[in-house]
Curated annotation (Swiss-Prot):
InterPro entries, per database record: Mur-like_cat_sf (IPR036565), Mur_ligase_C (IPR004101), Mur_ligase_C_dom_sf (IPR036615), Mur_ligase_cen (IPR013221), Mur_ligase_N (IPR000713), MurCDEF_pg_biosynth (IPR050061), UDP-N-AcMur_Ala_ligase_MurC (IPR005758)
Subcellular location: Cytoplasm
Name of the molecule in the record: UDP-N-acetylmuramate--L-alanine ligase
Gene that specifies this protein: murC
GO BP terms: cell division; cell wall organization; peptidoglycan biosynthetic process; regulation of cell shape
Amino acid sequence: MSLFRSRQAKIHFVGVGGIGMSGIAEVLLNLGYTVSGSDLRESETTRRLAGLGGRISYGHAAENVLQVDVVVISSAVKRDNPEVLEARRRKIPVIPRAEMLAELMRLKYGVAIAGSHGKTTTTSMAAHLLAHAGLDPTAVVGGKVNAFGSNAKLGKGDYMVVEADESDGSFLRIPPTIAIVTNIDPEHLDHWKTPDALRRGFVDFVNRVPFYGLAILCIDHPTVQSILPDVEKRAVTYGESHQADYRAEAIELSGHAVRFDAFRRDEALGRFEVAMVGRHNALNALAVIALGDEMGIPPLVTREALRSFQGVQRRFTVRGEAAGVTVVDDYGHHPAEVKATLQGAREAFKRRVVCLFQPHRYTRTRDLMAEFATAFNDADVLLLTDIYAAGEEPIPGATAANLADAIRAWGHRDVTLVPRAELARAARERVRPGDLVLTLGAGDVTAAGPELLALLER
């Protein structure tokens, strides 16, 4: 323990280029620890960590862990990884990323945001609010925050704002002082097995809050509302519901912004604006308004913070415009996220929407096939490409072709299956001036936007 507290520990990350791992590594580097890491390929993230003083290796090899005190892994790292095997052979502790994150949080008051969707945006907004209020928080986010130029920020204040990952249950390792839950949908059932087990996991997460802490819960979501009787700590709710402690009314969607009136029970807090698309982002902002109010931050400061929020990369990010076509990129890959993003795009821009969607993981495609079948109703044209495996093995029946058939069977009139290598060219043939093109998915479909723009500019 003294080794870690004195910042003499040598910490190695396997898969350091991952969005969850790199943020923790960056904070540790800025705190003065010796940090090394390995990844399969070079990226902007690994180059940034190397520039901060990290020793980065490409490829996984036993020699990478010979001089380290602890090895940090994510759930994506296989048990037979040579660095993990060598560390265990040498009796070097091998810990999940959440355990290292929890160790950092013990030094601060932790604000942890969890939920099936919206947690990256909400975490980023919360960190921005605390920074704007002069609290100088540390933050670890699951996406690159435009204002930080990174997915992490080391602050000198007493607060740490983190995105809590429920996918493998690791969020039960972290100790939040304030816990926010945005929603709970059936997801990651390869780990949780049943929706009820997932729901119980969120109950346990919220109840990790200390007696002096707080839970902030979205009452609009039925599963979140269902955990209220099981919450043992002080809790406030938010949403459009008239039963919410913090309520949003008169939501207005206009271009790249959402505006709404916020109330604390029946007391008006004012009209707020955030430069994000979609009704769901009004609720994400409302969670942050509730956080600020409960922390004693004046509503005027919160209003200014939300108005100046610059967003997160791959959350309805405009990639460019060419030949009268606007190209937008978004990380949404769950049916609820897809539906909300497409609905927000149509409501805000009132243009023809061409969606380029890449399913993410065979398990998700299999488990949520029916939900995906109705998620694309707000896309005039859907170009569906190959499943991004994310390390999974193929599953019989869980194919892009079967998904395309399901979407057509549920009534969509314009669905085309396109190989990933041909996606940009296929899109060029379908778009026309005035269209909004939306690349959607957590895989490499993000590159299809710039590819399309290059073709349109010729």
